[in-house]
Amino acid sequence: MQTLKFLISPVVLLLLITGCDNAVTPESAPEPAAEPMVTTTPLPVYNFPSETLLGLWIETAQACYAEAELSYLEFDAKTQEFLDAPSQTRLRQLQSAWATAHQHYAACRIFQQPTTGDSEGLALFRNQLDSWPIMGGFLDAVPEYPDTGLINDGVIALSVATLIEQHQLTDSTEVTLGFHALEFLLWGADAKRSYTDFMPYASEMSPMGFDTNRENRRRLVLTDLVALLLQQTEQLQARWLPSGTLAEMQALTPQKQTRFMLQSLSGFL
């Protein structure tokens, strides 16, 4: 699996970076002790050019995001197929596509560290994309409370703006965005979600002019969350265009480039 390559690559980079940072030059090597007399084989001195490390880092980041994008697009395609003709088989396929997309997102987290700025912007992205744990009942029904959640709230019109506004409104577990909100929609509270929960029905319009049918609202939330996920992951990937993180990294001194990569690795591992 290609994802494993991206998980292994950071480990290799860590070894390279550690070798660079800890390299012992002949000038700084300590004098050998006079006693006892021991014959040893000198350790090799690793002195990789910073351009090599930076190039490998950038190449891995861009490849990771490119493969992740394919998984997001596949997830979007499976979502549309499922909503067009809901069935238990298509729901299982959609759940599998979610798992693959989330796995790829997790593999690319190492490349989400800020370089010189915008740490708040990146933190917001991560918060909206991968918040955990979640209180599922804030979004949709749970067995003990079958009429709870935004989806079943007949006085709130659902939209992307509403979902963003309601996300962690009063508590960090009140999650209405990202992978785990989608996970709850697709599996339900007891992992026994039925495709019938997404069947389209005739609209049940409220006096305020929006649909209150829970299945239709669940379909709408699924559509909106996937669309927003694609938009946000695309923005993360765009950071590695020449005008984004790539330019910021290239502007750093070799020492700061190495420090940045090492800090990113330590935060990931």
Say what each PLM segment does.
Residues 1-18:
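Sec-dependent bacterial lipoprotein signal peptides
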Residues 12-13, 25, 39:
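N-terminal non-cleavable signal-anchor helices
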Residues 20-24:
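Bacterial signal peptide processing site
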Residues 32-269:
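Mature extracytoplasmic or organellar-lumen-exposed domains after removal of signal/transit peptides
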